[in-house]
Regions:
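Pyridoxal 5′-phosphate
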Residues: 1-185
């Protein structure tokens, strides 16, 4: 599906542009229809099928489609309620220990800062790579991640709209042995 095809499927886009997709936004008509059908089926046919079986089958199909789209295996895809939820799940899933290092930029949405602030109270060092006018200094980033356990940054920053060089930053983190968490909403 191309962006133009997606735009044609969203009734709200016929007369305007919508730019606030970080938190919510209008859906394609087929998404609204699918949600309506699911609610109606649950309300009127809940005795006919196990709703959990139906829901899990839907999750599995969605995971398979996302995996195919991004070139991953379905078991590598996690479906979360939001980016905030996903970041929090990762922050609590990694077994951080006192002295571990998490690196982030100063451009992050609160969802990309608050989990790490909580870990600071447990002895995890959080390094913030400062930027200038929304621009990231690659040398400063490389130095900051040298001994990091995890690096968290946004593909496109929410305050400046800066597009960070994701592939390069991921490669630098990988060379340092760090996990990378990219907010790519």
């Amino acid at each position: 599906m191309t962006p133009r095809e997606l735009r044609a499927d969203v009734p709200a886009f016929q007369e305007s542009a919508y730019l606030n997709f970080g938190a919510h936004g209008p859906s394609p008509a087929y998404v609204v229809d699918a949600v309506s059908d699911t609610v109606a089926d649950h309300e009127f046919n809940s005795g006919a099928d196990d709703p959990y079986t139906t829901a899990f089958a839907s999750y599995d199909r969605a995971r398979e489609r996302v995996a195919a789209f991004i070139g991953a295996e379905p078991e590598e895809v996690a479906l979360t309620e939001s980016t905030t939820d996903g970041i929090n799940r990762i922050a609590t899933a990694v077994d951080f220990e006192p002295g571990d290092v998490v690196v982030r930029t100063d451009l992050e949405h609160p969802a990309g800062t608050l989990p790490w602030q909580q870990l600071e109270a447990q002895g995890v060092e959080v390094r913030v790579v400062e930027t200038t006018d929304g621009r990231l200094d690659i040398d400063a980033y490389t130095e900051a991640v040298a001994d990091a356990r995890l690096v968290c940054f946004s593909a496109v920053t929410w305050t400046h709209g800066t597009q960070l060089p994701v592939s390069e930053l991921v490669d630098i983190a990988a060379e340092a042995g760090a996990f990378t968490l990219v907010d790519a909403v």
